[in-house]
Regions:
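Conserved RecA-like helicase motor core of SF1/SF2 enzymes
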Residues: 27-28
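Conserved helicase C-terminal RecA-like lobe
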Residues: 4-19, 23, 32, 39-181
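Flexible glycine-/small-residue-rich
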Residues: 1
């Protein structure tokens, strides 16, 4: 294939056929940084208790939430038996304006994405997700071919989302809403 984004179609076909495969000189589509980031936004939008997704995207794109703030969030979560989301919410209410504003911006982005999850077709959901999250702009700023390739991969993820319901059973409106799939 000529573009890394095109590998997704081939990989999906191989996976559906349940054939073992190995990629030489590259990374599997769903293992790529930008794809994992986008899927983590989707996971957190559907379940804000998902600590792995939270950790992956809390500062992607950069919001000024550093290691010190993450350590505070983890400690607060551990001490109060909270999810990282819950601990970050608590920290945002009890911290200085810089940390508080950065966390509130993050919550706002995830909340906007979450509200779309039940009201959009899955393709439209992912299209909006890559824009609202800032991932498309963030990766588009990477220099040269690397940035272009990452943006193409995000666009391919949107196309892949359109195909989630075109295979197998009849797709109806209820089934094509994100709230009914497991990411």
């Amino acid at each position: 294939y000529r573009s890394n984004a095109q590998s997704r179609i081939l990989e999906d076909s191989i996976l559906r056929a349940d054939l073992p495969y190995r990629i030489y000189g590259g990374v599997r589509f769903y293992e790529r940084l930008e794809i994992k980031n986008a899927l983590s936004y989707a996971k957190l939008a559907v379940d804000n208790q998902n600590d792995a997704a939270f950790e992956r995207i809390i500062n992607v794109p950069s919001r000024g939430i550093g290691a010190k703030t993450m350590d505070q969030i983890r400690e607060l979560a551990r001490e109060n038996t909270l999810s990282l989301w819950g601990a970050a919410k608590k920290l945002s209410d009890n911290s200085g304006p810089k940390v508080s504003n950065a966390l509130k911006e993050f919550f706002s982005v995830v909340d906007k994405i979450s509200k779309m999850a039940n009201n959009k077709e899955i393709e439209e959901f992912f299209e909006k997700l890559v824009d609202l999250s800032g991932l498309k702009e963030f990766h588009g700023k990477e220099p040269g071919e690397k940035g272009r390739s990452r943006v193409e991969n995000l666009e391919e993820l949107v196309s892949a989302a359109a195909g989630f319901f075109s295979i197998g059973e009849d797709a109806d409106d209820e089934r094509s809403q994100l709230s009914l799939i497991h990411i």
